Amino acid sequence: MKFEAIAVEKIPLIRKGDDLPYIICERIELQDRDIIVIASTIVAKAEGETFRLEDITPGEEALAIASRTGKDARFIQAVLSRSREVFVEAPFMLVTTLAGHTCVNAGVDESNIEHGFLLYPPKNPDSSASKLGERLESISGKKLSVIITDTNGRAFKIGQTGVAIGIYKIKPIKRWIGEKDLFDKVLEITEEAVADELAGAANLLMGEGAGGIPVAVIRGLDYYCEEEISMSENYRPEDMDVIKKGLRCLQKKN
């Protein structure tokens, strides 16, 4: 058994309104059940999620956080505008985004964008993935899956890795519960984060910085799924999330 990870090269600088699926299909011949992995940065740019820092007016909460942390209140406001809960204010803002993803700065970024601008993440990554997937399937005539990725750090390790934030026609979790291990024991809790694993594999090719490649294709793995799927399946239920519970307890003490 083997699979391929293929970099889709020569993607131009993306601007608002660009037809990403057409640009991708011009550069690679897609096959049935390919998994197209797309960096959230170019999805956001195509959707027009770029804003001038100088045009952002901070509200009371942003000003209060800025006074405590010394950060730019305009950047804080940008993060708050895409957040539904703030857990940590410094040395970075750890938040849960409107889409349910818990990450640093709500994915708002000052890199890979012109000076003085901020790049917001897609508002609804699952919806973005669906639109891209439907258009890619229409152009190519193939059955395809899509993963939109972002780069995240890990709570207890140094370094970043690619993770899935939006999906189309692929289940984010593979449940091994009920299967048997090598010693005939029944697995009770094993759930494999397939979408994140694929995002991480693609990120090895996609890279970071000026030399980054924003699109890769995973070929040879059949994770195609006709069901309507959401990344919400990948997020731990609130009553089971002990880390969030702990962070909320710390907030109350402070």
UniProtKB/Swiss-Prot annotation:
GO terms for molecular function: coenzyme F420-0:L-glutamate ligase activity; coenzyme F420-1:gamma-L-glutamate ligase activity; GTP binding; metal ion binding. A divalent metal cation 2 binds at T151, E208. Keywords: GTP-binding, Ligase, Magnesium, Manganese, Metal-binding, Nucleotide-binding, Potassium. A divalent metal cation 1 binds at D109, D150. Its EC number is 6.3.2.31, 6.3.2.34. Binds 2 divalent metal cations per subunit. The ions could be magnesium and/or manganese. InterPro entries: F420-0_g-glutamyl_ligase, F420-0_gamma-glut_ligase-dom, F420_ligase_CofE_arc. Disulfide bonds: none annotated. It catalyses: oxidized coenzyme F420-0 + GTP + L-glutamate = oxidized coenzyme F420-1 + GDP + phosphate + H(+); oxidized coenzyme F420-1 + GTP + L-glutamate = oxidized coenzyme F420-2 + GDP + phosphate + H(+). Pfam families: F420_ligase. GTP binds at residues 11-14, 40-41, 45, 112, 206-213. Pathway: Cofactor biosynthesis; coenzyme F420 biosynthesis. GO terms for biological process: F420-0 metabolic process. The keyword Transmembrane does not apply. Its cofactor is Mg(2+); Mn(2+); K(+). Homodimer. Belongs to the CofE family. Catalyzes the GTP-dependent successive addition of two or more gamma-linked L-glutamates to the L-lactyl phosphodiester of 7,8-didemethyl-8-hydroxy-5-deazariboflavin (F420-0) to form coenzyme F420-0-glutamyl-glutamate (F420-2) or polyglutamated F420 derivatives. This is Coenzyme F420:L-glutamate ligase. The gene is cofE.
